[in-house]
């Protein structure tokens, strides 16, 4: 059975995804930066209101995945908090200066995250050698790897995703980036059994007064009066598309 993980940038979105049939939530902040560690308030809200598994991302900043000592300390503190709050899993990753898995840091992360399922996030798509990385993450005991097959979209990276799925002796390969209703069957046909999607759309802010010429972001072209929200209808449609009955249609 194909599982659908929905990437959510708020508790409200996570509630919508859960009610619409998602199998798991990746809880994030910072949509425009590709996902950052959610606040304590968001974490607490998710624990109180969502029954399906929620795996928060722990990522202290946008940009690359090579962390200094201060940033790495923050990562470990955040993982401790996530574990103590009772979350079943966490999404995290670290690379070294040469683009390989940062093994010393990842060993510490695995120790701190003991008892939780660890997903190595799309830092995997920025690493030098995905096959070596897969072996290293297998030895570390990582539960799954979120990847676009080292391409901008998972559909473009499907060949590598298929190869990694066939080669993996442990971690589940979960396809993410550009996974949508129109292409889920391609991943199923490739033997990929976990999919990651934001399953939503940009929605306009309810604010009627909108100050012109002032931005809270250095990129003044960004629309700050919109936010990305999960669409429950899209989640439901994707779940129907990956149902066992549909899977049999793709196989036959």
UniProtKB/Swiss-Prot annotation:
GO annotation, cellular component aspect: cytoplasm
Q: Which gene encodes it?
A: cutC
User: Where primarily located?
Assistant: cytoplasm
| UniProt record similarity statement | Belongs to the CutC family.
- Highest taxon above the source species: Bacteria
The molecular function terms of the Gene Ontology recorded here are: copper ion binding
Q: List the disulfide bonds.
A: none
UniProt entry keywords in alphabetical sequence: Cytoplasm
Source organism: Pectobacterium atrosepticum (strain SCRI 1043 / ATCC BAA-672)
Q: Secretion signal: which residues?
A: none
What protein name applies here?
A: PF03932 family protein CutC
Q: Where in the cell is it found?
A: Cytoplasm
Identify the InterPro entries for this entry: CutC-like, CutC-like_dom_sf
